[in-house]
């Protein structure tokens, strides 16, 4: 990863003050998607990092994880598996609940999407608390998949999600860190 490439990616991500509520500085990854060079550079960095690791599946979490996970899976020549909110997947699923700041949420995965021994890379746009990826990791492991790596475009290290995921045995990678919440 060159400093110039990381700078291109980071500068394409807009920061929105007081969204979705007062006191939050929201990192808007959709502005990165609008910049073809930055988006291509993001996928290119992820491909370069993971191309020789032998993954058999890439799992992306709803919804922005799809935007980075699916093109990465195509470039790696492996299948893409979406993890979604309840009721959004048509085939049989398993579910995993996790705690949010103000409540509980649940994620689901198709029961036939991961098979015993699949080597899985988990991808999302942003790492904050790590709750979403912890739940995703539990789903993959419950189906017999091996997951040791999680990749993010953005990390908010002050919130501590990277430490939470490392405690689960995940190697955490992010392209750029941002200060704050």
UniProtKB/Swiss-Prot annotation:
UniProt subcellular location = Cytoplasm
EC number, UniProt record: 2.4.2.7
Q: Which domain of life is it from?
A: Bacteria
Q: How does it assemble?
A: Homodimer.
Entry keywords, A to Z: Cytoplasm, Glycosyltransferase, Purine salvage, Transferase
Transmembrane ranges, per UniProt, are: none
Q: Which GO terms describe its molecular function?
A: adenine binding; adenine phosphoribosyltransferase activity; AMP binding
Q: Which Gene3D superfamilies match?
A: 3.40.50.2020
The record's section on InterPro entries has: Ade_phspho_trans, PRibTrfase_dom, PRTase-like, UPRTase/APRTase
| General function of this protein | Catalyzes a salvage reaction resulting in the formation of AMP, that is energically less costly than de novo synthesis.
GO terms under cellular component: cytoplasm
| Chief site of localization | cytoplasm
Which species does this protein come from?
A: Vibrio parahaemolyticus serotype O3:K6 (strain RIMD 2210633)
Tell me the protein's name: Adenine phosphoribosyltransferase
Which pathway, per its entry?
Answer: Purine metabolism; AMP biosynthesis via salvage pathway; AMP from adenine: step 1/1
Into which family does the record put it? Belongs to the purine/pyrimidine phosphoribosyltransferase family.
Tell me the GO BP annotations in alphabetical order: adenine salvage; AMP salvage; purine ribonucleoside salvage
């Amino acid at each position: 990863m060159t400093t110039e490439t990381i700078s291109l990616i980071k500068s394409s991500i807009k920061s929105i003050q007081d969204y979705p509520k007062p006191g939050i500085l929201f990192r808007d990854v959709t502005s990165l998607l609008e910049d073809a060079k930055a988006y291509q550079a993001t996928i290119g960095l992820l491909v370069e990092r993971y191309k020789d690791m032998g993954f058999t599946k890439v799992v992306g979490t709803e919804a922005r994880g799809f935007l980075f996970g699916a093109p990465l899976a195509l470039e790696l020549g492996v299948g893409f598996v979406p993890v979604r909110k309840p009721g959004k997947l048509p085939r049989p699923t398993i579910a995993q609940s996790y705690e949010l700041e103000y409540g509980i949420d649940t994620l689901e995965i198709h029961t036939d999407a991961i098979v015993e021994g699949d080597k899985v890379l988990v991808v999302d746009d942003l790492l904050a608390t790590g709750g979403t990826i912890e739940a995703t990791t539990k789903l993959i492991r419950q189906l017999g998949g091996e997951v040791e790596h999680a990749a993010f475009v953005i990390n908010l290290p002050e919130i501590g999600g990277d430490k939470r995921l490392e405690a689960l045995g995940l190697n955490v990678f992010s392209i750029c860190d941002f200060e704050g919440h």
